Amino acid sequence: MPISSKFNQRVRARLEEDEFEQFSGESTSDEGLEGGESVEDEEEQEENSAEDHSEEDDDEGEEDDDDDGDVEDSSSDINPSLNAISFGALAKAQASLGKRKRPTASTGGISPKRAKVPGRHSPTPSASSSGEKQEPEPELSEYQKHLAANAKKPPQKLTHRTSKHAPTIQSSRHAVSRKRTILEPPPVPKARDPRFDSVVLSHSTNGNSSTASNAAIHARKNYAFLDSYRKDEIAQLRKQVSTLQTKKHKTNYDERELARLKRQITSMSDRQRTFERKEMEREVLVQHRRKERELIREGKKSQPYFLKRGEVKKEAVAKRFTEMSGKEKQRALERRRKKVAGKERKEMPWGRRVVE
């Protein structure tokens, strides 16, 4: 309820009493005294009502922002008969307005309750303020709001796979490639030798793992002559490489053929070394199992000890070194030394890589 309406009510009440006193001059003195007492009672009631209204205004002032702006417009609506209002009512009204207009240092003119409520507009400056207009806060753009929202979110870390056989973990925000396969060519048929196929071996042994391993061992023994064929093929390829290297006038075809032969020799030799390493590990494992059985039969051990994969590899390397000749050992040690030195050089800082 605006203050101007309250002032109008009080003015009307006092005017009615004054007019009544002026026109009732012929009445008795007792009636005049009673009228004066009634006027004083009405003034006290009006002051009490003004106090109640001022307290209500203090409570409602924190929720209504438009009351402060209406104070300036109320001055033009007040009648010129404000001189009849009592000074006590004016002082109380001024005190209530002073409490509502007093700015705070933390909120800059906004009440503490109003400062806590988000989305509220700052109150309009009143007539009792210093006259300085508060500058409106600049509105953030949508892009800035988006950046602020993303900045508050903690970065999500992808958990690592439990093992190398687990599926790859990838974020759902990963961009999909724009390349699409329209026509998929038919798969190229691969040659499969049933003698060494694990599917055929497991099917022939009715899924028994031990029997399948024995079948693979027997197949390896039965076709051991293929190793000699591979060695002969590698020797023939090396002869072709030597003839091409000694050729004086080399064409582009000769250069390409020489590079192809070198790649083929490297691939076949690596495959041959892999076969030999696996055969060595298998022999180490067979010998260990044989020793464990003998110890259990003699009663020296109650349970066998099963070698781990790393232990099998270490024993296979030691056995291979014992079977090597002097020159082969030196070559193997030199290759090992160069390999370790290369790893250390990669881990070394750039400033220390230069040899003084």
From Swiss-Prot:
The keyword Ribonucleoprotein applies. The keyword NAD does not apply. Keywords: Coiled coil, Nucleus, Ribonucleoprotein, Ribosome biogenesis, rRNA processing. Residues 28-75 have a biased composition (Acidic residues). Residues 322-333, 341-356 have a biased composition (Basic and acidic residues). Residues 202-216 have a biased composition (Low complexity). GO terms for biological process: maturation of SSU-rRNA from tricistronic rRNA transcript (SSU-rRNA, 5.8S rRNA, LSU-rRNA). Residues 230-278 form a coiled coil. InterPro entries: RRP36. Component of the 90S pre-ribosome involved in the maturation of rRNAs. Required for early cleavages of the pre-RNAs in the 40S ribosomal subunit maturation pathway. Associates with 90S and pre-40S pre-ribosomal particles. This is rRNA biogenesis protein RRP36. It comes from Ajellomyces dermatitidis (strain ER-3 / ATCC MYA-2586) (Blastomyces dermatitidis). The lineage of its organism: Eukaryota, Fungi, Dikarya, Ascomycota, Pezizomycotina. The gene is RRP36.
